[in-house]
């Protein structure tokens, strides 16, 4: 009830303003009695993924809490894990506003944020300050002004700084809002990046006495051949996981809606089938050797079950959380237990 009232107010605002107010409010209330407005007990449904045990298979996708300011609040909502970021080595403002648009009839969102964040050092401070023991994945990216050919260095800088504070690290090369970024999903650029990440992981595991899994986040706008090539590279470089998928550039499912023509990545319900198809193809290619975290268009427990049936070990929500609220976490956890 509280969420529906809050949503009604927020949906009258500019989407980015509403987002900033929400994150600020959650930051202030995450560790005090005011979290009673959203705190909930979620059905226990432990799952093992990437060698880690999560209390339930429902995570918060990257992009909502970019700077890790409200981790404890999302823990109170019962998420099995939170993925913060995308974070870059240096702070950056992102793309010009407006850059966030609701497609309410389709339960979709278009964004062209452009990795706006306060930088990796700020994120590390927030990770150190969190009170809860929730699993936290850190999604890392490159700065916009770093040439793609040198992008690998940005990932390694972020990885070194967040390693000891992260439950796992997600390597984001699939945002459509950073020029040239998606080119890192192919060929020599991909293999060079993954092998460098893996070597850095080995180095940092020895340094900190802690093995932190690494996962690759991929786009939905890939051919079968490209998915197969990515799967081969993941296996040959012994990556621990893959997150499928990021937002899509396709507008096939929202052609006549207001804001559909806006540039950026489309998420939410219109992405559901496309991301599920990618997961199915990945699962065939990976043959159970690398776990898949399914994300994209999960707006109900049934949507989540489709991701599990396609081959996902865990799922993440973002747009569905915006439209449905915290109750979606428990609904998915219960459906997972009952399946």
From Swiss-Prot:
Question: Domain of life here?
Answer: Bacteria
| Catalytic activity reported | (S)-dihydroorotate + a quinone = orotate + a quinol
Q: How is the cofactor bound, as the UniProt entry phrases it? A: Binds 1 FMN per subunit.
Task: Tell me the GO molecular function terms.
Answer: dihydroorotate dehydrogenase (quinone) activity
Q: Which UniProt keywords apply?
A: Cell membrane, Flavoprotein, FMN, Membrane, Oxidoreductase, Pyrimidine biosynthesis
Q: Which residues bind substrate?
A: 66, 111-115, 172, 177, 246-247
A GO CC term assigned to this protein in UniProt: plasma membrane
Instruction: Give binding positions for FMN.
Output: 62-66, 86, 139, 172, 217, 245, 268, 297, 318-319
Q: How does it sit in the membrane?
A: Peripheral membrane protein
Q: What is this protein's function?
A: Catalyzes the conversion of dihydroorotate to orotate with quinone as electron acceptor.
Quaternary state and partners of this protein?
Monomer.
Q: What family does this belong to?
A: Belongs to the dihydroorotate dehydrogenase family. Type 2 subfamily.
Q: Name the chain's protein.
A: Dihydroorotate dehydrogenase (quinone)
Q: Where does this protein come from, organism-wise?
A: Shewanella frigidimarina (strain NCIMB 400)
């Amino acid at each position: 009830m509280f969420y529906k009232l809050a949503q009604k107010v927020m949906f009258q605002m500019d989407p980015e303003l509403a987002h900033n107010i929400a994150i600020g409010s959650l930051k202030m209330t995450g560790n005090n009695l005011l979290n009673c407005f959203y705190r909930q007990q979620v059905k226990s449904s432990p799952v093992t993924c990437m060698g880690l045990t999560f209390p339930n298979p429902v995570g918060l996708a990257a992009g909502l809490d970019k700077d890790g300011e409200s981790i404890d609040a999302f823990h109170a909502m019962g998420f099995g894990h939170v993925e913060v970021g995308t974070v870059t080595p240096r702070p950056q403002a992102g793309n010009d506003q407006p850059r966030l648009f609701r497609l309410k009839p389709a339960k979709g969102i278009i964004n062209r944020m452009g990795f706006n964040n306060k930088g990796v050092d700020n994120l590390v401070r927030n990770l150190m300050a969190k009170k809860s023991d929730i699993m936290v994945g850190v999604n890392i990216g490159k700065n916009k002004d770093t040439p793609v050919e040198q992008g690998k260095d940005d990932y390694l800088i972020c990885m070194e700084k967040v390693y000891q504070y992260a439950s796992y690290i997600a390597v984001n090369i699939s945002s459509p809002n950073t020029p040239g970024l998606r080119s890192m999903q192919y060929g020599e650029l991909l293999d060079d990046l993954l092998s460098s990440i893996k070597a850095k992981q080995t180095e940092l595991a020895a340094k900190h006495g802690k093995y932190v899994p690494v996962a690759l986040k991929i786009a939905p706008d890939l051919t079968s051949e490209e998915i197969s090539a990515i799967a081969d590279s993941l296996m040959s470089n012994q990556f621990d996981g893959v997150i499928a998928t990021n937002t899509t550039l396709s507008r096939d499912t929202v052609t006549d809606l207001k804001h559909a023509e806006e540039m950026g990545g489309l998420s939410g319900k219109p992405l559901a089938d496309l991301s599920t198809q990618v997961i199915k193809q990945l699962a065939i290619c990976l043959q159970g050797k690398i776990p898949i975290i399914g994300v994209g268009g999960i707006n109900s427990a049934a949507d989540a079950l489709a991701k599990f049936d396609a081959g996902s070990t865990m799922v993440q929500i973002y747009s569905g959380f915006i439209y449905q609220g915290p109750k979606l976490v428990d609904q998915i956890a219960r459906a997972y237990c009952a399946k």
